[in-house]
Curated annotation (Swiss-Prot):
Source taxon at top rank: Eukaryota
InterPro entries for the chain: Gal_mutarotase_sf_dom, Glyco_hydro_31_AS, Glyco_hydro_31_C, Glyco_hydro_31_N_dom, Glyco_hydro_31_TIM, Glyco_hydro_b, Glycoside_hydrolase_SF
Annotated GO biological process: carbohydrate metabolic process; N-glycan processing
EC class name: hydrolase
EC number: 3.2.1.20
UniProt name for this protein: Neutral alpha-glucosidase C
Length: 769
């Protein structure tokens, strides 16, 4: 069926200004034609088109006004999403005068919420969804960009008053999207879907898929600006063990360096970083340290000297190294748009060069918008000059992208190409998913910031960046205890899971809030670790099939209109629905369970509801509203260790939630958790679990993969089994049958199988009779 879904330039807003040469630089000519051009340009200067003032700063535009723009009309679409990063609702809003969505990467400390201002990252990619169709627009431009949105709702009007019944016609709604960029070319991709999954795949063909993360990075991360010294690190690490709380990575902020000189260590505070890392290694944990793009101007700092000697810094208009103030004081900024600079920067992570680093050290890229104190909007001036003589205005939003790229490549190179990197970045662009994780920046310890984190992460997720998270507890300020507990509970069900706080905040380790609250935080973190097999499998699908890990409901239920504007609950993969508690002193939450033919099971109580309705769920402070979708199988770990490294050989459990038809399906992806062997040598296991006609089958989902594993499935829980079985047996691939002891609960219609020993890597069946 032919259907017009998108029109280009229907409002006639196509605009393109070519680069010009400043008239004063032209050779003087006496003819009147040249004189008239000069006069025209002088008039443009008077209008600020060639020279613009921002406070005390003057932005001289070497090539004159160079903006571009184009409008798109989306037919029948009223629900739009994407164009992160904004602390705004998931569904994009109509914009008014001076209220456009701004894409301009900025260091905004304690950013305002429900605001269209630009913050740390930009992805110029918009999705539109309606019943039966999803489309996308990818506006590939790294300069400052504004996006205006205006929806014309559907209207019904009378064609004629003739006859007994007036003829009526309904005009479909239309949404107009106007893209405007300060400079660059018009390079736009239209993604026609028609399904959300199709659009995700089409976009990933252009920008890449989410990098497969090392397993440790899906665990809990403990960070603070700053842990004081090696003894502090040792004490915090021991505190997690003492309180039986798992965690995987300790983080060090800028104070670990010698005067904010990156790739160095403070000799008084961290005199023996290798020994500190060996302590963490003995606990099967990692260390993450910060590395920012500004380099302290210091003739005794080798990184600065080598970069300056090779001309690797961004330049000012006079051709000298651009200088700005950041954490170390006066600094120069590496020009990551230059491939040679990226190659050199990557080499700095080699173990002989980065002294004190080991193979358990990973990286955090911050301040890479780039942040420049005391400059316009606290960033680099637009007329700074990059590689190829391009002005900063042309590529501002991609600066942090290149920084993370060079860092990730450095971590890969130091291992000889064998090990996966982990790099967290604050600034990002389309395609940043290929190099690591992103977080929402300097949030505040308030309930409203917990609440806004959900739509912010959903927007990142559908624009390709699945590995995303928000600082637990809020970076700025001191959260009340209830808020901190609720934030841990929410964060445990979000992709990147890190506690972080500014240097002015009180210490915030999980055991500092009383015994009961420590228990609640411990339970939330342990729930995360128990679900790591499911998380890891979801990231594999994000990596190979472009499917978001954290999904808005409309992605999973694209034909259910009520889901289109929901942002307080979401799906993890296709199996789990999560509704974090984001209000203080809440005693109930209203949870919408979608799908008229679905059945949903409370993850803890096993109570079940039919889909297509809103249910009021009572919540105490220990309640995390999570529901498993009927028809799914979720793999878990039956025991939780001190970190992911302690759990590689521990047993699995399967949570089988039956659909209304009595069937279920699920998957497990497994590899060594750290190397590229899954890619180069096909060293992985991909298993499929299917339940039908009272038989659970474990089979291979991908015959190409081979990975030796002694792990067994120890427990199986079947939800929605309406009749108690007479007996249960296992049937192995060698033809042997074994009876299985079981427990059936009629109240919850659940069947529990314990003390099994079914190898995860081999085919087998469990028969319920």
């Amino acid at each position: 069926e032919e259907e017009v879904v998108i029109s280009i330039n229907s409002l006639g807003q196509l605009y393109f200004e070519h680069l010009q040469i400043l008239h004063k630089q032209r050779a003087a000519k006496e003819n009147e034609e040249e004189a008239s051009v000069d006069t025209s340009q002088e008039n443009q200067e008077d209008l600020g088109l060639w020279e613009e003032k921002f406070g005390k700063f003057v932005d001289i535009k070497a090539n004159g006004p160079s903006s571009i723009g184009l409008d798109f009309s989306l037919h029948g679409f009223e629900h739009l999403y994407g164009i992160p990063q904004h602390a705004e609702s998931h569904q994009l809003k109509n914009t008014g005068d001076e209220d456009a969505y701004r894409l301009y990467n900025l260091d905004v400390y304690g950013y305002q919420i429900y605001d269209k201002m630009g913050i740390y990252g930009s992805v110029p990619y918009l999705l539109a969804h309606k019943l039966g169709r999803t489309i996308g627009i990818f506006w590939l431009n790294a300069s400052e960009t504004l996006v205006e949105i205006n929806t014309e709702p559907a209207v019904e009007y009378t064609l004629s008053q003739m006859g007994p019944v007036a003829a009526k016609q309904k005009v479909r709604s239309r949404t107009h999207v106007h893209w405007m960029s300060e400079s660059g070319i018009i390079d736009v991709f239209l993604l026609t879907g028609p399904t959300p999954s199709d659009v995700f795949k089409q976009y990933s063909h252009l920008t890449g898929t989410q990098a497969m993360p090392p397993l440790f990075s899906l665990g809990y991360h403990q960070c603070r600006w700053n842990y004081e010294d090696e003894q502090d690190v040792k004490a915090v690490d021991a505190g997690f063990d003492e309180h039986d709380i798992p965690y995987d990575a300790m983080w060090l902020d800028i104070e670990h360096t010698e005067g904010k000189r990156y790739f160095t260590w403070d000799k008084k505070r961290f005199p023996n970083p290798e020994r500190m890392q060996e302590l963490l290694r003995s606990k099967k944990r990692k260390l993450v340290v910060i590395s920012d793009p500004h380099i302290k101007i210091d003739p005794d700092y080798s990184v600065y000297v080598k970069a300056k000697d090779q001309g690797f810094f961004v330049k000012n208009q006079e051709g000298e190294d651009f200088e700005g103030v950041c954490w170390p004081g006066l600094s120069s900024y590496l020009d990551f748009t230059n491939p040679k600079v990226r190659e050199w920067y990557s080499s700095l992570f080699a173990f002989p060069v980065y002294q004190g680093s080991t193979d358990i050290l990973f990286l955090w890229n911050d301040m890479n918008e780039p942040s420049v104190f005391r400059r316009p909007e606290q960033t680099m001036q637009k007329n700074a000059i990059h590689h190829g003589n391009w002005e900063h205005r042309e590529l501002h939003n991609i600066y942090g992208f290149y920084h993370q790229m060079a860092t990730a490549e450095g971590l890969i190179q130091r291992s000889g190409g064998k090990e996966r990197p982990f790099v967290l970045t604050r600034s990002f662009f389309a395609g940043s998913q290929k190099y690591g994780a992103v977080w929402t920046g300097d949030n505040t310890a308030e309930w409203s910031y917990l609440k806004i984190s959900i739509p912010m992460l959903l927007t990142l997720s559908i624009t390709g960046i699945s590995f995303c998270g928000a600082d637990i507890g809020g970076f700025i300020g001191n959260p009340e205890t209830e808020l901190l507990v609720r934030w841990y509970q929410a964060g445990a069900y979000q992709p990147f899971f890190r506690g972080h706080a500014t240097m002015n905040a009180k210490r915030r380790e999980p055991w500092l809030f009383g015994k009961e609250h420590t228990r609640l935080i411990r339970e939330a973190i342990r729930e995360r670790y128990g679900l790591l097999p499911y998380w890891y499998s979801l990231f594999y699908h994000a990596h190979v099939a472009s499917q978001p890990v954290m999904r808005p409901l409309w992605v999973e239920f694209p034909d259910e209109l009520k889901t289109f504007d929901m942002e307080d609950e979401y799906m993890l993969g296709s199996a789990l629905l999560v509704h974090p508690v984001t209000e203080p002193k809440a005693t109930t939450v209203d949870v919408f369970l979608p799908g008229s033919n679905e059945v949903w099971y409370d993850y803890k109580t096993f109570a079940h509801w039919e889909g297509g309705c809103t249910v009021k769920i009572p919540v105490a402070l220990d309640t995390i509203p999570v529901f498993q979708r009927g028809g799914s199988v979720v793999p878990i770990k039956t025991t939780v260790g001190k970190s992911t490294g302690w759990m590689t050989e521990s047993s699995y459990g399967l949570r089988v939630a039956l659909s209304t038809k009595g069937s279920s399906v699920g998957e497990l992806y497994l590899d060594d958790g750290h190397s590229f062997q899954y890619l180069h040598q096909k060293q992985f296991l991909h298993r499929k679990f299917s339940f039908c006609s009272s038989v659970l089958i474990n089979s291979s989902a991908d015959q190409r993969g081979h990975y030796p594993s002694k792990c067994v499935v120890e427990q199986i829980l079947v939800l929605g089994l309406r009749k108690e079985p007479s007996f249960v047996t296992t049937h192995s691939s060698d033809g042997k049958d074994q009876p299985v002891a079981f427990t059936y609960c009629a109240k919850t219609s659940s069947l529990s199988l314990e003390k099994l020993s079914l190898n995860i890597a081999t085919d087998w069946e469990v028969r319920i009779i």
